[in-house]
Amino acid sequence: MDSSNAIFKSFLGKAPEWYKICIIAFLVINPLIYFFISPFVAGWALVAEFIFTLSMALKCYPLQPGGLLAIEAVFIGMTSAHHVKEEIMANFEVILLLMFMVAGIYFMKQLLLYVFTKLLIVIHSKKILSLAFCLSATFLSAFLDALTVIAVIISVGTGFYGVYHKVASGNSFEDSTDISNDEKIITNKEILEQFRAFLRSPLMHAAVGSALGGVMTMVGEPQNLIIAGQAEWGFVEFLLRVLPVSLPVLICGVITCLLLEHFKIFGYGARLPRRVWGVLARYNLLKEQRMTQQDRVKMGIQALAGIWLVVGLALHLADVGIIGLTIIIICTAFCGITDEHAIGRSFQEPMPFTALIVVFFTVVAVIVDLKLFEPIISYVLSADPHSQLALFYVFNGLLSMISDNVFVGTVYINEAKTALESAIISREQFDLIAVAINTGTNLPSVATPNGQAAFLFLLTSPFAPLIRLSYGKMLYMALPYTIVLSIIGFLSLEFLLPPLTELMSNWGWIITR
């Protein structure tokens, strides 16, 4: 084997050869487009290529191919290293969240698995169980960040999967085995596939639930805080102003959840195999029998840490990542986990995604520097006031499907604020536009993992390949929700928001500044 073949073989590891050739082609083509055709076209090509690497996440983790494309983009001048740093610092809360909050949830796994196992054993109806996951995620994400909620759900799902996988492999509950290795599973493969299909349903219901709750409050999503700051709204005012859109969407989202499970369409409706239920019930009984006073104390400490987590985030007592760090310290200190390697294991899952998010911010920097969204923004602001709400909602939604919704929301609200200060739009129109931006970035963005950081985190987590949740599968399962949420959001914005906002203003519930 000559050196060139050896380099090609080691390049991107076990990824398919056609995929390696695609990435090499992108790296060759991008500078040519940038220098000889148009920087604008090159920028959109980079965005499309990055989305492609995300869609192939099960073939190759997107960090390496996406990272190479991002490095080249900086090297040829599509953006600068300084601007990348500025984007990272502007989104540093997200970095801290991924580093510490996800690791903090790891140390609450014992309590979470105990509670959700009880839930799974007690609730026999798949519809009620799906609804419970959807509404739990909705409620939690109204006060917590959606990434935190998804981290909890992933932790629980991995726990369930691991319990059955060990038994199906012929091991006991206590054995330490590689749950990604199916070689020892011979007779139970069909049941394992059914279990995977079952796990995908509540996971996707919860993921969409996090978006339903995230749109409602100013702490639900990072861009909500930015929008609330520009509009000078408090917690209650934000909730009230968004309610004419968020409440109908929530009701229709819940109905969609029930209909999907009832008609067993779009990959939903798979039931928990009886044998798996038996394994989980035995596991729960065994844990109950073997639970010592020390175990109960540990779960009590984790419960108190969970209460602090909800209160701290709901009242915004500190940044999300800092609260996550306090969870790590409290849980490890009082549960007796002081070994450096034991603590280090909690960081194994979030760190690759944290690195991927930094690469994503590089692509965002390219979007800003090459003004890829500027033609759309100019078109929306030049429209007549009656059409502006619909246009802001639609274009926010479309751009949020392919780009970070925090970035899209920030760009649009800043442009709207500039238009207000320039007297291009009135204050009343600005308030309505702010709601359109908030709902536009949060609702249609469930269509793809690109728009919602929580969805991207789920797709690139180690749990996704275990249950065969690919990019395409996520698109397919999210499709009915995308259609319902987007249409109901649009209709509510057009026909309910202006009259109900005026009504609340007349009642004195909200004020026009």
Curated annotation (Swiss-Prot):
Swiss-Prot/TrEMBL catalytic activity: 2 Na(+)(in) + 3 H(+)(out) = 2 Na(+)(out) + 3 H(+)(in)
Transmembrane segment boundaries: 21-41, 88-108, 119-139, 243-263, 299-318, 322-344, 350-370, 389-409, 477-497
A Gene Ontology molecular function term of the record: sodium:proton antiporter activity
Record gene name: nhaB
GO cellular component entries: plasma membrane
Protein name, as recorded: Na(+)/H(+) antiporter NhaB
Membrane topology: Multi-pass membrane protein
Keyword Cell division set for record: no
